[in-house]
Curated annotation (Swiss-Prot):
Organism: Pseudomonas fluorescens (strain Pf0-1)
Family: Belongs to the class-II aminoacyl-tRNA synthetase family.
Record's protein name: Histidine--tRNA ligase
Catalysed reactions, as listed in the record: tRNA(His) + L-histidine + ATP = L-histidyl-tRNA(His) + AMP + diphosphate + H(+)
HAMAP family: His_tRNA_synth (MF_00127)
Keyword Secreted set for record: no
GO MF terms held by the record: ATP binding; histidine-tRNA ligase activity
Record-level GO cellular component terms: cytoplasm
First-level EC class: ligase
Main location: cytoplasm
This enzyme's EC code(s): 6.1.1.21
Keywords linked to the UniProt accession: Aminoacyl-tRNA synthetase, ATP-binding, Cytoplasm, Ligase, Nucleotide-binding, Protein biosynthesis
Biological process, per Gene Ontology: histidyl-tRNA aminoacylation
CDD domains associated with the record: HisRS-like_core, HisRS_anticodon
Length: 429
Protein backbone atom coordinates (compact mmCIF):
# COMPACT_ATOMS: atom_id res chain seq x y z
CA UNK A 1 0.00 0.00 0.00
CA UNK A 2 1.37 3.41 -0.92
CA UNK A 3 2.15 5.81 1.89
CA UNK A 4 -0.45 8.54 2.30
CA UNK A 5 0.74 12.02 1.40
CA UNK A 6 1.28 14.33 4.34
CA UNK A 7 3.35 17.31 5.40
CA UNK A 8 7.02 16.80 6.24
CA UNK A 9 7.67 16.39 9.96
CA UNK A 10 8.18 19.78 11.57
CA UNK A 11 6.69 21.66 8.61
CA UNK A 12 3.12 22.55 9.38
CA UNK A 13 0.10 23.76 7.46
CA UNK A 14 -1.46 26.94 8.81
CA UNK A 15 -5.18 26.30 8.45
CA UNK A 16 -7.94 28.85 7.77
CA UNK A 17 -9.03 29.01 11.41
CA UNK A 18 -5.43 29.86 12.39
CA UNK A 19 -4.58 32.47 9.76
CA UNK A 20 -6.65 35.35 11.25
CA UNK A 21 -4.34 35.42 14.28
CA UNK A 22 -1.27 35.35 12.04
CA UNK A 23 -2.65 38.18 9.91
CA UNK A 24 -3.48 40.19 13.02
CA UNK A 25 0.05 39.74 14.36
CA UNK A 26 1.75 40.43 11.03
CA UNK A 27 -0.44 43.47 10.39
CA UNK A 28 0.28 44.91 13.83
CA UNK A 29 4.03 44.50 13.30
CA UNK A 30 4.07 45.90 9.75
CA UNK A 31 2.12 49.01 10.77
CA UNK A 32 4.52 49.62 13.64
CA UNK A 33 7.55 49.26 11.39
CA UNK A 34 6.03 51.63 8.83
CA UNK A 35 5.53 54.18 11.60
CA UNK A 36 9.20 53.91 12.59
CA UNK A 37 10.40 54.39 9.00
CA UNK A 38 11.47 50.85 8.09
CA UNK A 39 11.21 49.56 4.51
CA UNK A 40 10.41 46.00 3.51
CA UNK A 41 12.87 43.85 1.56
CA UNK A 42 12.19 40.37 0.17
CA UNK A 43 14.93 37.79 -0.38
CA UNK A 44 14.89 34.27 -1.88
CA UNK A 45 14.50 31.35 0.50
CA UNK A 46 17.36 29.50 -1.23
CA UNK A 47 20.95 30.78 -1.17
CA UNK A 48 24.39 29.40 -1.96
CA UNK A 49 25.58 27.32 1.01
CA UNK A 50 28.82 29.29 1.17
CA UNK A 51 26.87 32.38 2.25
CA UNK A 52 25.88 30.78 5.54
CA UNK A 53 29.26 29.15 6.14
CA UNK A 54 30.95 32.54 5.81
CA UNK A 55 28.43 34.48 7.88
CA UNK A 56 27.04 32.17 10.57
CA UNK A 57 30.29 30.25 11.09
CA UNK A 58 31.28 26.75 9.98
CA UNK A 59 31.52 25.40 13.55
CA UNK A 60 28.08 26.56 14.69
CA UNK A 61 25.29 24.07 15.35
CA UNK A 62 23.27 25.60 12.52
CA UNK A 63 25.90 24.96 9.84
CA UNK A 64 27.14 21.66 11.26
CA UNK A 65 23.81 20.00 12.05
CA UNK A 66 20.71 21.93 11.08
CA UNK A 67 20.86 23.28 7.53
CA UNK A 68 18.83 21.84 4.65
CA UNK A 69 21.57 21.64 2.01
CA UNK A 70 21.40 20.03 -1.41
CA UNK A 71 23.18 20.04 -4.76
CA UNK A 72 21.30 21.40 -7.76
CA UNK A 73 21.58 20.20 -11.36
CA UNK A 74 24.54 22.50 -11.99
CA UNK A 75 26.47 20.98 -9.13
CA UNK A 76 26.09 24.05 -6.91
CA UNK A 77 25.57 23.55 -3.18
CA UNK A 78 22.39 25.36 -2.14
CA UNK A 79 20.73 25.79 1.24
CA UNK A 80 17.25 26.70 2.44
CA UNK A 81 17.90 29.80 4.53
CA UNK A 82 18.16 29.03 8.27
CA UNK A 83 18.00 32.74 9.20
CA UNK A 84 17.53 36.07 7.46
CA UNK A 85 20.44 38.34 8.36
CA UNK A 86 23.02 36.73 6.07
CA UNK A 87 20.64 36.83 3.10
CA UNK A 88 19.77 40.46 3.79
CA UNK A 89 23.46 41.42 3.96
CA UNK A 90 24.07 39.57 0.70
CA UNK A 91 21.20 41.49 -0.91
CA UNK A 92 22.36 44.95 0.19
CA UNK A 93 25.90 44.17 -0.95
CA UNK A 94 24.79 42.78 -4.30
CA UNK A 95 22.65 45.83 -5.04
CA UNK A 96 24.95 48.40 -3.48
CA UNK A 97 22.29 50.08 -1.37
CA UNK A 98 24.57 50.71 1.61
CA UNK A 99 27.38 52.27 -0.39
CA UNK A 100 28.63 55.72 0.54
CA UNK A 101 27.40 55.32 4.09
CA UNK A 102 23.71 55.21 3.11
CA UNK A 103 21.57 54.36 6.11
CA UNK A 104 19.21 51.48 5.42
CA UNK A 105 16.47 50.43 7.85
CA UNK A 106 14.98 47.23 6.46
CA UNK A 107 12.57 44.50 7.51
CA UNK A 108 11.51 41.16 6.06
CA UNK A 109 9.11 38.34 6.74
CA UNK A 110 9.09 34.73 5.68
CA UNK A 111 9.90 31.09 6.35
CA UNK A 112 13.25 29.81 7.64
CA UNK A 113 14.41 26.19 7.77
CA UNK A 114 16.42 24.22 10.33
CA UNK A 115 16.59 20.47 10.81
CA UNK A 116 15.93 20.46 14.55
CA UNK A 117 13.91 18.10 16.71
CA UNK A 118 10.33 19.41 16.47
CA UNK A 119 8.61 20.29 19.73
CA UNK A 120 6.17 22.86 21.03
CA UNK A 121 7.24 26.24 19.69
CA UNK A 122 10.08 24.83 17.56
CA UNK A 123 9.66 23.61 14.00
CA UNK A 124 11.76 22.73 10.97
CA UNK A 125 9.99 25.32 8.88
CA UNK A 126 9.31 28.39 10.99
CA UNK A 127 8.48 31.99 10.24
CA UNK A 128 10.28 35.12 11.30
CA UNK A 129 9.97 38.86 11.04
CA UNK A 130 13.44 40.38 10.97
CA UNK A 131 14.91 43.89 11.03
CA UNK A 132 18.34 44.98 9.86
CA UNK A 133 19.85 48.47 10.09
CA UNK A 134 23.06 49.43 8.29
CA UNK A 135 25.49 52.35 8.69
CA UNK A 136 24.44 53.44 12.16
CA UNK A 137 26.93 52.52 14.88
CA UNK A 138 25.65 54.26 18.02
CA UNK A 139 23.68 52.86 20.94
CA UNK A 140 20.69 54.98 19.90
CA UNK A 141 19.71 52.64 17.08
CA UNK A 142 20.24 49.58 19.31
CA UNK A 143 17.84 51.21 21.75
CA UNK A 144 15.32 51.96 18.99
CA UNK A 145 15.07 48.28 18.07
CA UNK A 146 14.38 47.33 21.67
CA UNK A 147 11.96 50.22 22.18
CA UNK A 148 10.00 49.14 19.09
CA UNK A 149 9.61 45.62 20.41
CA UNK A 150 8.59 46.99 23.82
CA UNK A 151 5.87 49.04 22.11
CA UNK A 152 4.81 45.98 20.10
CA UNK A 153 4.43 43.86 23.23
CA UNK A 154 2.23 46.60 24.69
CA UNK A 155 0.00 46.75 21.61
CA UNK A 156 -0.35 42.97 21.66
CA UNK A 157 -1.10 42.86 25.39
CA UNK A 158 1.82 40.57 26.26
CA UNK A 159 4.25 43.03 27.88
CA UNK A 160 3.89 41.49 31.35
CA UNK A 161 4.75 38.04 30.00
CA UNK A 162 8.15 38.85 28.46
CA UNK A 163 11.50 39.85 29.94
CA UNK A 164 14.44 41.60 28.27
CA UNK A 165 17.91 40.11 28.75
CA UNK A 166 20.98 42.14 27.73
CA UNK A 167 24.70 41.57 27.31
CA UNK A 168 27.66 43.03 25.44
CA UNK A 169 30.10 40.80 23.57
CA UNK A 170 32.54 43.65 22.94
CA UNK A 171 34.68 43.97 19.84
CA UNK A 172 36.37 41.01 18.18
CA UNK A 173 39.61 41.96 19.95
CA UNK A 174 38.14 42.12 23.46
CA UNK A 175 36.10 39.01 22.76
CA UNK A 176 39.31 37.24 21.76
CA UNK A 177 40.92 38.12 25.10
CA UNK A 178 37.85 36.88 26.94
CA UNK A 179 37.79 33.68 24.91
CA UNK A 180 41.37 32.91 25.95
CA UNK A 181 40.52 33.40 29.63
CA UNK A 182 37.37 31.30 29.33
CA UNK A 183 39.18 28.46 27.56
CA UNK A 184 41.88 28.45 30.23
CA UNK A 185 39.27 28.26 33.00
CA UNK A 186 37.09 25.61 31.32
CA UNK A 187 40.09 23.49 30.38
CA UNK A 188 40.97 23.29 34.06
CA UNK A 189 37.47 21.89 34.69
CA UNK A 190 37.27 19.79 31.53
CA UNK A 191 36.16 16.58 33.25
CA UNK A 192 33.16 18.33 34.82
CA UNK A 193 31.79 19.54 31.49
CA UNK A 194 29.09 17.65 29.61
CA UNK A 195 30.04 16.03 26.32
CA UNK A 196 28.53 18.75 24.14
CA UNK A 197 30.32 21.49 26.09
CA UNK A 198 33.61 19.61 25.75
CA UNK A 199 33.11 19.66 21.99
CA UNK A 200 32.18 23.34 22.01
CA UNK A 201 35.25 24.15 24.09
CA UNK A 202 37.35 23.08 21.09
CA UNK A 203 35.22 24.61 18.34
CA UNK A 204 33.26 27.59 19.73
CA UNK A 205 34.04 28.19 23.44
CA UNK A 206 31.57 31.04 23.98
CA UNK A 207 28.70 28.68 23.18
CA UNK A 208 29.48 26.78 26.39
CA UNK A 209 27.98 29.76 28.23
CA UNK A 210 24.44 29.00 27.05
CA UNK A 211 24.51 25.33 28.02
CA UNK A 212 21.39 23.85 29.60
CA UNK A 213 23.36 21.14 31.41
CA UNK A 214 23.16 21.60 35.19
CA UNK A 215 26.68 20.29 35.91
CA UNK A 216 28.26 22.61 33.36
CA UNK A 217 26.18 25.51 34.63
CA UNK A 218 27.64 24.88 38.09
CA UNK A 219 31.15 25.10 36.62
CA UNK A 220 30.29 28.40 34.94
CA UNK A 221 29.34 30.10 38.22
CA UNK A 222 32.98 31.04 38.86
CA UNK A 223 33.98 31.43 35.20
CA UNK A 224 35.48 34.72 33.96
CA UNK A 225 32.85 37.37 33.15
CA UNK A 226 32.64 39.00 29.74
CA UNK A 227 32.09 42.43 31.32
CA UNK A 228 35.57 42.33 32.86
CA UNK A 229 37.17 42.08 29.42
CA UNK A 230 35.21 44.73 27.54
CA UNK A 231 37.19 47.45 25.80
CA UNK A 232 36.41 51.10 26.60
CA UNK A 233 34.47 51.62 23.36
CA UNK A 234 32.17 48.65 23.98
CA UNK A 235 31.75 49.62 27.62
CA UNK A 236 30.67 53.15 26.63
CA UNK A 237 28.34 51.78 23.95
CA UNK A 238 26.65 49.44 26.42
CA UNK A 239 26.35 52.21 29.00
CA UNK A 240 24.68 54.42 26.38
CA UNK A 241 22.20 51.68 25.50
CA UNK A 242 21.25 51.09 29.13
CA UNK A 243 20.83 54.84 29.71
CA UNK A 244 18.36 55.06 26.84
CA UNK A 245 16.36 52.08 28.04
CA UNK A 246 16.29 53.58 31.54
CA UNK A 247 15.08 56.89 30.11
CA UNK A 248 12.15 55.19 28.39
CA UNK A 249 11.41 53.01 31.40
CA UNK A 250 12.10 49.61 29.86
CA UNK A 251 13.17 47.06 32.50
CA UNK A 252 15.98 44.65 31.65
CA UNK A 253 18.15 41.97 33.20
CA UNK A 254 21.90 41.76 32.55
CA UNK A 255 22.76 38.21 31.49
CA UNK A 256 26.54 37.68 31.22
CA UNK A 257 25.96 34.23 29.68
CA UNK A 258 23.93 35.57 26.76
CA UNK A 259 26.06 34.99 23.65
CA UNK A 260 23.60 34.06 20.84
CA UNK A 261 24.14 31.08 18.54
CA UNK A 262 25.69 32.88 15.58
CA UNK A 263 29.34 33.88 15.19
CA UNK A 264 28.79 37.32 13.68
CA UNK A 265 27.51 39.20 16.76
CA UNK A 266 29.53 41.95 18.49
CA UNK A 267 28.82 44.47 21.23
CA UNK A 268 25.06 44.48 21.97
CA UNK A 269 23.13 41.21 22.14
CA UNK A 270 19.62 40.87 23.54
CA UNK A 271 16.76 38.44 23.90
CA UNK A 272 13.11 38.78 24.84
CA UNK A 273 12.14 35.65 26.77
CA UNK A 274 8.98 34.30 28.35
CA UNK A 275 8.27 31.56 30.88
CA UNK A 276 4.82 30.87 29.41
CA UNK A 277 5.90 28.52 26.60
CA UNK A 278 8.03 25.92 28.35
CA UNK A 279 11.56 25.28 27.12
CA UNK A 280 11.23 27.39 23.97
CA UNK A 281 11.14 30.70 25.77
CA UNK A 282 12.94 33.07 23.37
CA UNK A 283 10.43 35.00 21.25
CA UNK A 284 12.72 37.72 19.86
CA UNK A 285 16.50 38.04 19.73
CA UNK A 286 19.21 40.02 18.04
CA UNK A 287 22.17 42.30 18.38
CA UNK A 288 24.96 44.14 16.64
CA UNK A 289 27.17 42.69 13.88
CA UNK A 290 29.60 45.44 12.90
CA UNK A 291 32.05 43.10 11.17
CA UNK A 292 29.66 40.97 9.13
CA UNK A 293 29.40 43.09 5.98
CA UNK A 294 33.19 43.29 5.68
CA UNK A 295 33.44 39.57 6.43
CA UNK A 296 31.17 38.95 3.45
CA UNK A 297 33.23 41.04 1.05
CA UNK A 298 31.90 44.56 1.59
CA UNK A 299 33.41 47.65 3.11
CA UNK A 300 33.34 48.08 6.90
CA UNK A 301 29.66 48.74 7.66
CA UNK A 302 28.05 48.77 11.10
CA UNK A 303 24.92 46.68 11.39
CA UNK A 304 22.34 45.73 13.98
CA UNK A 305 19.13 43.73 13.85
CA UNK A 306 16.80 41.18 15.36
CA UNK A 307 14.34 38.47 14.44
CA UNK A 308 11.12 37.43 16.14
CA UNK A 309 9.51 34.02 15.85
CA UNK A 310 5.94 34.26 14.58
CA UNK A 311 4.88 30.77 15.69
CA UNK A 312 6.02 31.38 19.26
CA UNK A 313 4.45 34.82 19.49
CA UNK A 314 1.16 33.58 18.06
CA UNK A 315 1.27 30.73 20.59
CA UNK A 316 1.94 33.26 23.35
CA UNK A 317 -1.04 35.36 22.25
CA UNK A 318 -3.24 32.27 22.35
CA UNK A 319 -1.85 31.12 25.70
CA UNK A 320 -2.50 34.52 27.28
CA UNK A 321 -5.88 34.86 25.51
CA UNK A 322 -4.81 38.18 24.03
CA UNK A 323 -6.53 37.78 20.67
CA UNK A 324 -9.21 40.43 20.05
CA UNK A 325 -12.63 38.87 19.59
CA UNK A 326 -13.14 40.46 16.19
CA UNK A 327 -9.94 38.82 14.90
CA UNK A 328 -11.45 35.35 15.17
CA UNK A 329 -14.51 36.51 13.27
CA UNK A 330 -13.85 36.45 9.54
CA UNK A 331 -17.34 37.52 8.42
CA UNK A 332 -19.32 40.55 9.60
CA UNK A 333 -22.47 40.10 7.54
CA UNK A 334 -23.90 37.10 5.70
CA UNK A 335 -26.41 37.65 2.89
CA UNK A 336 -29.07 34.97 2.35
CA UNK A 337 -31.07 35.12 -0.87
CA UNK A 338 -33.99 32.86 -1.80
CA UNK A 339 -34.95 32.42 -5.43
CA UNK A 340 -33.14 33.25 -8.66
CA UNK A 341 -34.40 36.86 -8.83
CA UNK A 342 -33.36 37.51 -5.23
CA UNK A 343 -29.95 35.95 -5.84
CA UNK A 344 -29.28 38.32 -8.74
CA UNK A 345 -30.52 41.34 -6.80
CA UNK A 346 -28.52 40.27 -3.75
CA UNK A 347 -25.34 39.97 -5.78
CA UNK A 348 -25.74 43.50 -7.15
CA UNK A 349 -26.72 44.88 -3.73
CA UNK A 350 -23.66 43.30 -2.11
CA UNK A 351 -21.34 44.95 -4.62
CA UNK A 352 -22.93 48.38 -4.06
CA UNK A 353 -22.42 47.96 -0.32
CA UNK A 354 -18.80 46.92 -0.87
CA UNK A 355 -18.25 50.05 -2.96
CA UNK A 356 -19.35 52.19 -0.02
CA UNK A 357 -17.88 50.06 2.80
CA UNK A 358 -14.63 48.54 1.49
CA UNK A 359 -13.63 47.27 4.95
CA UNK A 360 -16.89 45.41 5.56
CA UNK A 361 -16.50 41.64 5.55
CA UNK A 362 -19.61 40.65 3.63
CA UNK A 363 -20.20 37.08 2.50
CA UNK A 364 -22.90 36.22 -0.02
CA UNK A 365 -24.38 32.74 0.22
CA UNK A 366 -23.28 30.49 -2.62
CA UNK A 367 -24.95 27.27 -3.65
CA UNK A 368 -28.57 28.36 -3.07
CA UNK A 369 -30.32 26.22 -0.44
CA UNK A 370 -33.38 26.42 1.75
CA UNK A 371 -34.06 29.13 4.32
CA UNK A 372 -32.96 26.77 7.08
CA UNK A 373 -29.74 25.67 5.38
CA UNK A 374 -28.69 29.22 4.49
CA UNK A 375 -29.29 30.42 8.03
CA UNK A 376 -27.27 27.51 9.34
CA UNK A 377 -24.36 28.58 7.13
CA UNK A 378 -24.80 32.20 8.24
CA UNK A 379 -24.57 31.17 11.87
CA UNK A 380 -21.58 28.91 11.25
CA UNK A 381 -19.73 31.71 9.46
CA UNK A 382 -19.53 33.66 12.71
CA UNK A 383 -21.24 36.69 11.20
CA UNK A 384 -22.79 39.28 13.47
CA UNK A 385 -25.79 39.85 11.22
CA UNK A 386 -27.71 38.10 8.47
CA UNK A 387 -29.24 39.93 5.53
CA UNK A 388 -32.39 38.30 4.16
CA UNK A 389 -33.65 38.75 0.64
CA UNK A 390 -36.75 36.81 -0.42
CA UNK A 391 -39.96 37.42 -2.37
CA UNK A 392 -41.47 39.82 0.20
CA UNK A 393 -38.27 41.84 0.48
CA UNK A 394 -37.91 41.99 -3.29
CA UNK A 395 -41.43 43.35 -3.65
CA UNK A 396 -40.72 46.15 -1.15
CA UNK A 397 -37.06 46.71 -2.19
CA UNK A 398 -35.91 46.14 1.37
CA UNK A 399 -33.62 43.62 3.02
CA UNK A 400 -34.21 41.83 6.29
CA UNK A 401 -31.56 42.70 8.87
CA UNK A 402 -31.30 40.07 11.63
CA UNK A 403 -28.83 40.06 14.57
CA UNK A 404 -27.19 36.65 15.03
CA UNK A 405 -25.06 37.21 18.14
CA UNK A 406 -27.32 38.92 20.62
CA UNK A 407 -30.67 40.44 21.34
CA UNK A 408 -32.57 42.43 18.78
CA UNK A 409 -35.50 42.09 16.46
CA UNK A 410 -35.29 41.67 12.72
CA UNK A 411 -35.69 44.96 10.85
CA UNK A 412 -36.46 45.87 7.28
CA UNK A 413 -33.91 48.22 5.72
CA UNK A 414 -34.36 49.94 2.37
CA UNK A 415 -31.73 49.00 -0.18
CA UNK A 416 -30.52 52.58 -0.53
CA UNK A 417 -30.10 52.88 3.26
CA UNK A 418 -28.36 49.55 3.81
CA UNK A 419 -24.76 50.77 3.60
CA UNK A 420 -25.38 53.58 6.08
CA UNK A 421 -27.10 51.17 8.46
CA UNK A 422 -24.24 48.67 8.25
CA UNK A 423 -21.72 51.45 8.79
CA UNK A 424 -23.42 52.31 12.07
CA UNK A 425 -23.95 48.75 13.29
CA UNK A 426 -20.81 47.01 12.08
CA UNK A 427 -18.04 49.28 10.83
CA UNK A 428 -18.34 51.86 13.60
CA UNK A 429 -19.44 49.69 16.25
Amino acid sequence: MSKSLQAIRGMNDILPEQTPVWRYFEGTVSRLLDNYGYKQIRMPIVEFTELFKRSIGEVTDIVEKEMYTFEDRNGDSLTLRPEGTAACVRAVLEHGITGGGQVQKLWYIGPMFRHERPQKGRYRQFHQIGLEVFNLDGPDIDAELIIMTWRLWGELGIRDAVKLELNSLGTSESRGRYREALVEYLSAHHDKLDEDSQRRLKTNPLRVLDTKNADTQAVLVDAPKMADYLDDESRAHFKGLKARLDAVGIPYVLNPKLVRGLDYYSKTVFEWVTDKLGAQGTVCAGGRYDGLVEQMGGKPTPGVGFAMGIERLVLLLETLEQIPEEISRQVDVYLCAFGEEAELAGLALAERVRDQLPNLRLQVNAGAGSFKSQFKKADKSGALYALILGDDEMAQQVVGFKPLRGQGEQQSIAWDALAAHLATCVVQG
